Amino acid sequence: MATLNEFMKFTKEVLDDFASRVEDNSRKRFLRKYKFQKKASTKGSLYNAINKKVQVFENSILVSFPFMKDVDYAKFVDQGVKGKTSSYSPSKTSPFKFGSGTGKKGGLTNAISQWVKSKRFQFRTEDGRFMSYQSMTYLISRKIYNKGIPAKKFFTRSFDEAYKNLPDEIIEAFALDVKQRFKEFTTK
């Protein structure tokens, strides 16, 4: 008896193409500059982690995108985070919110402090002196906490766009699989 991998050859190819389209479009959208950004995103650990996985089991085919679980902040970049006082318009529908009491205290401040020190830049005060890293961390953290993080929807939009065509493609591929299998049975 043929395995699912042999029997569903065309269907697996369609699902693999679907996953590849989502992966490629997610990478393109991630680097795109949005109106709320001063400049486009850079290729960092999240960009490099964007991947797909298509697995064939005994009676099913699984398409997954493990980077959404592997990179702990991927969902926040994709869906955004609502701020405590106001939010960016793309983040209004986000399930995540600063000040909800679910995150660890001081996590944002520590991360911003490390980021500011690694980038090695400093703001200037009104009289021209450089601000301390601690003051910059406070200002940036307060802004993010109050305004939130805008949603990029780099994965969500890519998935939804590719998913629109998927049902028709799967029907055609499944029909080809059945047709091929039927030919094998009738020619024996």
Task: Please give the residue ranges for each predicted region.
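Short, Lys/Arg-rich flexible segments
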Residues: M1-A74, P90-K92, F96-K188
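Charged low-complexity regulatory regions
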Residues: F76-K84, G107
